[in-house]
Amino acid sequence: LNAGSGSGYSTWSPASADGRWMAERNRDLYAKIIVEANRIAVRNRRGAANFIVGTPKVCAILEMLPEFQWMQVSGNVNTQPVGIARVGNLGGRFNVYRDTRTEAQLATSGYDGDNARAAELNYVLLGYKGPEFYDTGLIYCPYIPVMVQRTIGPNDFSPRVGLLTRYGVVDNIFGADLYYHVIIVKNLGDAFTPGTTSVYFG
């Protein structure tokens, strides 16, 4: 988000979408995703966004699109029911992941007033991950269990052993902001005009 509006993040609202009914508004969000995905390709010169992380409501909107393909789960797989889970593929170009952790920050989820969010937050995080481990915005440098180094103590010449272990999560040297974009989705469940009961995705 530090990259700023238009580069690091943008907003989308169903009230301002170019659509007459729910399916057309869903397509408008999909069009916004494609535009921002291609802007990532222009910024990083590596490729367009190829994965999406979204809140449950945003994933529900994406799942209604005809381009969405469900991820097949075999019966013998031990699935993880919480956290971030892969839910499918959109248009053959985006792997879609659902983030259920964001919803846990709402006041209705058991948090007290000091730690609760004032309003529900919905978003679409677009990102690019290339074929190489370094071809991404954030790089996980893996944990090395133990490196052992033998040495001699300089004061008494007794044998010593040094142990070292480390890992790191670092930004790409050219900038992590070139690989990601957040679309903040506003006004889900709000009436388009005051005093009406008609809402989009309430």
Show where each model-derived region lies.
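Sequence/fold signature of self-assembling virion shell proteins
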Residues: 4, 11-39, 43-46, 50-51, ...
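P-loop NTPase motor catalytic core
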Residues: 1
